[in-house]
Amino acid sequence: YLLVTAHYDHLGKTALGIYHGANDNGSGTVSVIEIARALGALKPHPRRTIVFITLFGEEEGLLGSYYYAHHPLFPLKDTIVDINLEQMGRTDDPAGKKAGEFTVTGPSYSNVASILGEAAKAEDIGVYTRKDADDYFDRSDNYSFAQFGVISHTVVVAVDFPDYHGLGDNWEKIDFANMAKVDRGVAAGILRLANDADAPVWSNAPGAAIYRNAGR
């Protein structure tokens, strides 16, 4: 099995106003739906079953993914990877515009980033690496599955987009054309993971040891 996940909750409403969460994480939720629609229409079906899940409570402490990890519909011992989608719609980042590319959290922890990147080339999508990418590994729902030994990573377009957890995270700022293109690249990577004879593997990076040795 493969998991493809995204959280659909956000911060809600406060005295300051409504936090719409269009990019974080409406965009990730839409990406899960669209990738599921595209891959679900393929004939023949992929070699491995792909399970698409939208999760609640990420902003409250990864609650939805924590629950699924403890009550899986399909055995985690038979789950080879989780690809978690976050902030797929905005390209504006203080480090420069992130059009036509995405990054993967914890890239040194497994060979998943290289698999996704190689497959995404067919859609003219690149993968960029942040120096602090490993530091973001435990910041989203992938972390719940990694604690059970499932290779899990979060895919992000613009990590530090303006309006993060702000009132200005509105749909008008989403780059829909780029989002569709990146989704196609990510879908190509997911399909490769689903069809490859070899499952992805944890690396020997020191930071991966705790997950590599986690009990299933």
For the regions a language model picked out, list residue spans one by one.
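Alpha-helical metal-binding/catalytic segments enriched in His/Glu/Asp
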Residues: 4-61, 186
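Short acidic, glycine/proline-rich loop/turn micro-motifs
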Residues: 14-19, 94-97, 165-169
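Soluble non-cytosolic domains of exported or imported proteins
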Residues: 22-30, 44, 59-63, 106-111, ...
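Extracytoplasmic/secreted envelope proteins and their assembly/folding machinery
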Residues: 29, 33-36, 62-69, 113, ...
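C-terminal soluble interaction/assembly domains
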Residues: 31, 36, 40-45, 62, ...
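His/Asp/Glu-rich mid-to-C-terminal helical/loop segments that flank catalytic regions of hydrolases
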Residues: 37, 41, 162-216
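Surface-exposed patches in mature extracellular/periplasmic domains of secreted proteins
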Residues: 48, 126-135, 197-205
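Metal-dependent peptidase/peptidase-like ectodomains
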Residues: 55-154, 158-160
